[in-house]
Amino acid sequence: APIKGYSVTVXLYIFDCQKWSSNYPHKPNFSDATDPKGPWCYTTDYXGAASVTRSGLRGDEQTPHRHTFSPQSFAGLTTACVKGTGEGYRGTAALTVSGKACQAWASQTPGDVYSCQGLVSNYCRNPDGEKLPWCYTTEYCNVPSCTGGPTGSEYHEILTPAQDXYTGIVEDYRGKMSPDAGLEENFCRNPDQDPQGPWCYTXNPEAXPRYCDVLSVVGGXEAQRNSXPRQISLQYGWQTVHVQSIHAEPRGVDIALVKIAPPAQLTACVITXWGETQGTGEDVQFCAGYPEGGTDPVSLVCLEPCVLAPVLVGVVILPXNDRXQ
């Protein structure tokens, strides 16, 4: 029979004692004939009060939470990020968003470990369909989402230094990622659709992958033909043409008007500009050039007032004593 007057709280086998008022994990059911010799207690080991064949886990590792979900199986497993609500996440993140360490999943024993859920160590998981992977603490886990806006997965420029000036190293990711991910040398890439953009492994063996300092393209659109204003590229070309006639008049000018035949083959070009009409009487004619020097009033940037027709038809050169139009 139990020896009255003892208040021992640890059993002979170094298991925490179950409270006498508790029915978990053992429902009290004993008699004088079945009691062990000496002071005893029900332990938190599921195998029994006096069993040494199954060690079990300490009862304090079952706190502060007990599992209440039912096991299920999920497809589409991921390790680096979260798809949807993360039921298939099998990575090794084990901290909450505020940096709290996760409680070990094995602390749910006695009970089913639910191996189909990948409940390993204290890594973040989502076995019950919560909105994000979680662990037994009070917060959701800090795991990046697999979906979102542009992530730089198509970035293939040759840029190696990471954001904190570490040098990238070559890492064999080809067997794990898409064959067209551009994983050559040690250049910055984003083969896993990381929402923070291109990254690389560094030469520091103790450091995690580093994100690269790559400029992002924001805004802008392709310029359409005849749109105003627009930028164009002027490139040199060479043609051999025949001169039909030369007009050197009026006297006093330093250029001549040359007529060629057949006409030169030119590329169509539309230029939008602005300038001062200075009494020409036409919205498509404006004066350019200062004989005294200075800034030309004609600019190839569309500012106010803009000319109505954005087409430069021709240039008229007059003698030096007249105004150039």
Swiss-Prot record:
One of its GO terms (molecular function) is signaling receptor binding. Disulfide bonds join C81-C146, C102-C135, C124-C141, C188-C212. PROSITE patterns: KRINGLE_1, KRINGLE_2. It is found in: Secreted. One of its GO terms (cellular component) is extracellular space. Residues 80-146, 159-217 form the Kringle domain. CDD domains: KR. It catalyses: Preferential cleavage: Lys-|-Xaa > Arg-|-Xaa, higher selectivity than trypsin. Converts fibrin into soluble products. Keywords: Blood coagulation, Disulfide bond, Fibrinolysis, Hemostasis, Hydrolase, Kringle, Protease, Secreted, Serine protease, Tissue remodeling, Zymogen. One of its GO terms (biological process) is tissue remodeling. Its EC number is 3.4.21.7. It is an enzyme of class 3 (hydrolase). InterPro entries: Kringle, Kringle-like, Kringle_CS, Kringle_sf, Peptidase_S1_PA, Serine_protease_kringle. Plasmin dissolves the fibrin of blood clots and acts as a proteolytic factor in a variety of other processes including embryonic development, tissue remodeling, tumor invasion, and inflammation. PANTHER family: KRINGLE DOMAIN-CONTAINING PROTEIN (PTHR24261:SF7), PLASMINOGEN-RELATED (PTHR24261). Belongs to the peptidase S1 family. Plasminogen subfamily. This is Plasminogen.
